A protein has these predicted regions:
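Long, charge-rich, low-complexity alpha-helical segments
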Residues: 1-47
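Canonical Radical SAM [4Fe-4S] cluster-binding loop centered on the CxxxCxxC motif
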Residues: 36-37, 41-72, 84
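Local cysteine-cluster metal-coordination motifs and their immediate loop/turn environment
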Residues: 49-59, 271-274, 316-334
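A short acidic, helix-capping loop that chelates divalent metal ions and anchors anionic groups
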Residues: 63-65, 149-156, 219-221
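Radical SAM/AdoMet-radical enzyme domain recognition
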Residues: 71-92, 99-212
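C-terminal accessory region of radical SAM enzymes
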Residues: 177, 215-249, 274-321
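Short, small/polar residue-rich loop motifs at catalytic or cofactor-binding pockets
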Residues: 254-258
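Short, acidic, Ser/Thr-enriched surface-loop or helix-capping motifs
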Residues: 263-264
């Protein structure tokens, strides 16, 4: 634990003494985490093409018509991902429903994988026909809406998207599918919409997902739409500070590259969508026999987060010498 962070010796000693005191009071207990306890998740970007052009898209998806991998190549990726034994596989994009072979791919994945299948979509292309497919083969559908009405949604996602999404959610629900989540990106400029977003989800019977704006992808060019804060200011959504929340407190660490991976539309593997710079690419899944080969450095070491620390990936150059970085609770990729 101590060696994993850039701390002064006096700070390491202080933390050790604090931990020992908490354990003596039984406010902190030692819990061994085994390999079987780790819940792996992997997201696969089936395509980078999208029918929308959202201003904050982290993968810069749009109607660029980037070449998709073939059906056979995606199935090869599926097989390697399944062998990694993740708890959940999410099919994302771009817009995954744009792929003409989406039905074939989803059916194949369900037939060969017993874990949790999620589909991340903008919700605009859901029809009666593919809704039947989603209801039958997917366990969870995550829809990005980024607004609470036509006016607020159109700023980020374009005109007409809001009503289309609401209508298609009801199509899914009318078919008996209720595991639908709605996500919205927040920062200081639109935080006043948080209560309305939660109320919208209550009315729709969907699960609200609150995301924090990140300056990655097209977000680098649209910060003025979301935030006036400087680099040293951190925005924290109200839902993260809810004192009435029943969520159990615990220690949380970045899972990127350890039990979370992101496969891009071209087969490149990254620790997560927030780390998609060239220097963070772990390799191409199509060029290896199994995923574990991508999680080994030149010395055969399998601790990706150690590599991340060595390259300042977790705490970046701007935070490398900060004495409080250990206690920072924001996503290091943001």
């Amino acid at each position: 634990f101590r060696s994993s962070f850039k701390l002064k010796e006096k700070d390491k000693k202080y933390i050790e003494e604090a931990i020992e005191a908490l354990m003596e009071c039984q406010l902190l207990v030692d819990s061994k985490t085994t390999e079987t306890d780790i819940k792996k998740n992997i997201s696969i970007e089936l395509t980078n093409n999208c029918n929308l052009h959202c201003v904050h898209c982290c993968v810069e998806a749009g109607e660029k018509r980037k070449k998709d991998l073939s059906t056979e190549e995606i199935i090869d990726i599926f097989n390697k991902c399944i062998s990694w034994n993740p708890k959940m596989i999410t099919l994302s994009g771009g817009e995954p429903l744009l792929r003409k072979d989406f039905k074939e791919l989803l059916v194949y994945l369900r037939s060969n994988y017993n874990g949790h299948i999620g589909v991340s979509t903008n919700g605009t292309l859901i029809t009666n026909s593919n809704a039947d497919l989603l209801v039958k083969y997917a366990d969870q559908i995550d829809i990005s809406i980024d607004g609470v009405d036509e006016e607020t949604c159109s700023i980020v996602r374009g005109k007409g998207v809001f009503e289309n999404v609401i209508r298609n959610i009801k199509v899914l629900q009318d078919k008996g599918f209720n595991n639908v989540s709605l996500s919205m990106v927040f920062s200081d400029k639109n935080e006043y919409l948080e209560p309305a977003f939660l109320e919208l989800n209550r009315q729709l019977g969907t699960t609200p997902i609150t995301r924090v704006f990140a300056e990655i992808g097209r977000g680098k060019d649209s910060k003025n739409i979301f935030s006036d804060k400087g680099i040293d200011d951190v925005y924290i959504p109200e839902t993260f500070l809810d004192l009435n929340s029943k969520q159990q407190l615990g220690v949380r660490t970045c899972s990127a590259g350890r039990n979370q991976l992101f496969v891009r539309y071209n087969g490149e593997v990254y620790p997560c969508p927030s780390y998609m710079k060239r220097e963070y690419c772990l390799g191409n899944i199509l060029k290896v026999q199994k995923i574990d080969e991508l999680l080994v450095d030149s010395e055969g070491k399998k601790d990706i987060q150690e590599l991340m620390l060595k390259t300042d990936m977790l705490y970046g150059k701007k935070c490398a010498n900060c004495e409080l970085s250990l206690f920072c609770w924001t996503c290091p990729g943001e």
